């Protein structure tokens, strides 16, 4: 997992193929309407908006074919993280959606507007949650094939 200011994410371009195109797309979207925006090579950017949910009892997710870059545009969210190898897969891994749901023990951090985090296939992550008080957020989720 990588956590950094969005403006510094370019430092990781060598290990994140497709990053440059995604950053340009996010910068070009004037209204950032919640939707899915396709990129080349099966990559995409999802603009999401909502209110965080309680982390209590929530399941994490992990992917096998994509990594996520979650960039908080407005507000904040807390994210839970744990190595996927330490988690328990709940049900079947959904190959079509490239998503498995996991339970286990997580470490949490709050991500503020202007910051992003990168989660790789080995990172179980619980995005869009809160520990105490719900918070509104708007974010760009960049999905890059690995």
What is each residue range found by the language model?
Residues 65-77, 85, 92-98, 143-144:
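Short, conserved beta-strand element in jelly-roll/cupin
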Residues 1-47, 57-62:
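A short, N-terminal "cap"/entry segment at the start of jelly-roll beta-barrel domains
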Residues 110-129:
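Conserved metal-binding segment of the jelly-roll/cupin
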Residues 40-42, 62-66, 72-74, 112, ...:
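Short connector loops at helix/strand junctions that flank enzyme active sites
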Residues 69, 116-118, 134-146:
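A short hydrophobic beta-strand segment most commonly corresponding to one strand
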Residues 65, 101-106:
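Short alpha-helix capping/helix-loop boundary micro-motifs
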Residues 45-63, 73-87:
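Conserved short histidine dyad/triad with adjacent acidic residue
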């Amino acid at each position: 997992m990588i956590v950094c200011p969005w403006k510094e994410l370019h430092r990781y371009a060598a290990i994140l193929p497709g990053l440059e195109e995604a950053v340009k797309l996010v910068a070009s979207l004037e209204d950032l309407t919640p939707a899915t925006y396709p990129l080349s090579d099966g990559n995409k950017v999802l603009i999401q908006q909502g209110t965080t949910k309680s982390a209590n009892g929530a399941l994490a997710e992990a992917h096998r074919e994509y990594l996520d870059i979650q960039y908080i545009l407005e507000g904040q969210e807390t994210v839970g993280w744990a190595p996927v190898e330490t988690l328990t897969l709940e049900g079947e891994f959904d190959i079509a959606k490239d998503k498995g749901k996991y339970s286990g023990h997580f470490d949490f951090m709050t991500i503020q507007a202007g910051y992003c985090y990168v989660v790789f296939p080995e990172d179980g992550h619980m995005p869009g949650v809160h520990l105490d008080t719900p918070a509104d957020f708007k974010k760009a989720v960049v999905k890059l094939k690995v």
